[in-house]
């Protein structure tokens, strides 16, 4: 069994996974999943405790004596780890594949050697579980859903030991967020600080899960489209696989219209705003004023823009709005936006490029402030410089990315205020955005 994470896996976790792989090789009988994971995490805990708490001046015998005195501690740890592992599986944070995918660039020569040993054709031919499958099919990962699942030697496991959490899910009155319920779908007024359908490592704390429970449904609701975790507003959840496919088709055919209300830190011009977004699925999303071959067109239409008071300190505290250092926090600008293309972070990135970042947007506002203070810092902006070499340009891009901050923890000034499809035959609106909230 080989433990891995995504492409950013550390060599430490690969090494721990390889230790279990060797253990299974010595005793290649099928093992219950949670037993192996418990052993894996216990090994990690022992290594950590031994490394940080055993004095380095101890002789081997003294160290063994010290460890024997900590038996009670380790037993307590093992129980807690067992409970922790059950939670990880419940959260959907554990995956498996019959054959391990290619190791990451950080893998050592020894780790690569062991990987090759357990994925050699002569070894794979002996495994009954992958007969009739191509290597690519056998390397496909699946989420573990039961703690009593059995695995065999050579199985790949990916364990996300630090799932992204969404504590706000437990603070929401979910029934009050339901906008509409039909036989085919549910429309939800999604709270900010929550995930629509969950993340790679957490499908438990999601809008789909909590809305399903609030309505007492026996079949889980399904995600049809996404909005950012820090965005609130209208989301359509399908009640059946069939309608999920139907709604996806409507999105592809551009039959779904979305209106947003954005709270910007500066005024935004009325009309259509166009940029080009770098086709890399990684935040922050970089956009260019000018056309760049291969970059994706981003268009939105600002329908109106009006002055409103900047959210007061009480509202900011209630909704955990982050202070991103905007110089003047008295007047904000509420904009109604028709989203013409649906790119990830599109409104956030485009308005920041217009020197009007969203209130509370800790990712894009710092970069917008940096560009305002040092025009030309943005290598794709209005005041971009001419670079003499590709190396200089690459360094400028790296420096520009570093000007961006982290993803907001809870909320930004953005609401998906209306969603409609089939030429307005189905139209739904969210409640008042958080910044209009009256504090009792």
Annotated model-derived regions:
Residues 30-36:
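Short, aromatic-rich membrane-interface segments at the entry and exit
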Residues 22-28:
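Hydrophobic alpha-helical transmembrane segments
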Residues 50, 146-156, 161-210, 215, ...:
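RNA pseudouridine synthases
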Residues 2-9, 13-16, 20-22:
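Short, low-complexity, Lys/Arg-enriched N-terminal segments of secretory-pathway carbohydrate enzymes
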Residues 12, 17, 25, 33, ...:
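Pseudouridine synthases involved in rRNA/tRNA modification
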Residues 94-96:
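A short, conserved structural fragment
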Residues 92, 133-136, 141, 262:
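Contiguous, often N-terminal, cationic amphipathic patches that form binding interfaces
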